[in-house]
């Protein structure tokens, strides 16, 4: 049966691949992003703009009568020293990555019924934070926790909710990540070392289509688990960390990403 699927950030990377997979499946896909496209099924707005999001989702819901699947994929990354990051950039990241998720969910729920699904794209970094990526990790951690709460809150309505935590994926996400390289004598070269460590994994990252295909198959399940980790390495790591003291885990991660000055 044809489904109405709404994807934020659906014009690039994982979002675009998901759009293509659902369209190939015969579903009607509506995308929301800041890009301006000549496509009647695309809506150009920032998910951080609450009023615009409500207008777009209302238009979709009124036209089709219902929304079967909402995928909150819009977001961007940031790295830098927390002490030195511009607060406006931090607020902008939280507005897009976290508040944008809330805005779309609040607007869409009234068009969603029993059997519909909300899929929030979080990140493996919500589970395994690394130095100098704390703002992004905390935003994705908030998305993960929100998903857990909504799974309970919406269960009586028959709405399935899950969070997807992908590991390293080869998209323009890393290239487009806001990178603040300002440092001082308190941090020395640690930021540079951590950035180099992260960027050095580029060739080892999972392809976007591979990640999207795994997510697509998950969404096709009738019942959804509270969250899914994409990437065997990260699933194994998650299992191992359940039996590892948090202080030990943080110390190991810190050493891998620059450690001390």
Where in the sequence are the language-model features?
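Substrate-binding pocket helix/loop in short-chain dehydrogenase/reductase
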Residues: 81-82, 86-91
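Active-site helix of classical SDR
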Residues: 105, 139-142
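Conserved glycine-rich cofactor-binding loop
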Residues: 11-12
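The beta1-alpha1 cofactor-binding region of Rossmann-like NAD(H)/NADP(H)-dependent oxidoreductases
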Residues: 44-55, 87
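Residue(s) in the substrate-gating loop at a strand-loop-helix junction
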Residues: 123
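A short, exposed helix-loop element centered on a Lys and neighboring polar residues
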Residues: 105-106, 148
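SDR active-site lid
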Residues: 156-225
